[in-house]
A protein has these predicted regions:
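Hydrophobic transmembrane helix bundles of membrane-integrated enzymes that assemble
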Residues: 1-116, 164-220
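Long extracytoplasmic/lumenal interhelical loops at the membrane interface
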Residues: 110-113, 119-180
């Protein structure tokens, strides 16, 4: 599947191009978040009904792996919250697949991007990634008191390639605060919490286990 989305030129021919060939045709973390919440929902559903085959966990992990590093990191939360012993063979098979790719194909541009934290860990650099380092060093800052209260009313800058987001930040929290202040950010959290709770009420008898774990995943 190709993509009809118009994206910045830097994504075409880059190591992130593999993420364009998905149903959502997106090269950004939203694709990881979609598959992550799908995995979380299926694990929660299976915890209640115990009807889904364990091999589905392996396939979901493989699908999520090609969507981005957000899935790779946060899927651990879902697995720990809804762990079943019968998932162990699928988890071991997935771990072996990841280690084999990271060990034998670290120079492959797609593997290098998707499994960067694992590759760094195998080479003694710790479980880190360039995107996390960039976020911590270049995109996080403390807004002024005025920005917290009144905000700047800006979300995008109008640039097409670099610096598209106001404040040149890649942090979702800061983007909301700069746009509408801390009150607006709290409203966004409240709306997210409302929909997560509605899903829990409709599917999982209002399970706070699902509500809190899903909200933690979405908050990150």
């Amino acid at each position: 599947l190709s993509t009809n989305a118009v994206l910045p030129a830097r994504f075409y021919g880059s190591e992130q191009e593999y993420r364009l060939y998905n149903i959502t045709a997106t090269a950004f973390f939203q694709l990881s978040l979609f598959y992550l919440m799908l995995l979380h929902f299926l694990l929660a559903y299976n915890a209640k009904h115990n009807t889904l085959p364990s091999i589905l966990v392996f396939f979901m992990l493989c699908i999520g792996l090609i969507s981005g590093r957000t899935f790779l990191l946060l899927s651990v939360v879902s697995i720990l919250v809804y762990f079943k012993w019968r998932y162990v063979p699928s988890l071991i098979a997935f771990a072996i697949l990841v280690l084999l790719l990271a060990y034998f194909l670290p120079e492959n541009p797609y593997v290098a991007h998707a499994l960067e934290p694992v590759i760094n860990l195998l080479h003694g650099a710790g479980f880190v990634s360039s995107s996390t380092d960039t976020l911590m060093k270049n995109h996080l800052f403390m807004p002024t008191l005025k920005q917290f209260i009144y905000a700047d009313g800006m979300y995008m800058t109008g640039q097409l390639e670099v610096g598209r987001y106001y404040g040149h930040t890649d942090s979702g929290f800061l983007r909301q605060i700069l746009y509408g202040g801390v009150s607006y950010a709290l409203v966004c959290f409240a709306v997210t919490f409302y929909f997560v709770r509605k899903v829990a009420l409709n599917w999982f008898d209002g399970s706070w286990k699902f509500i809190l774990s899903a909200f933690v995943i979405l908050a990150f």
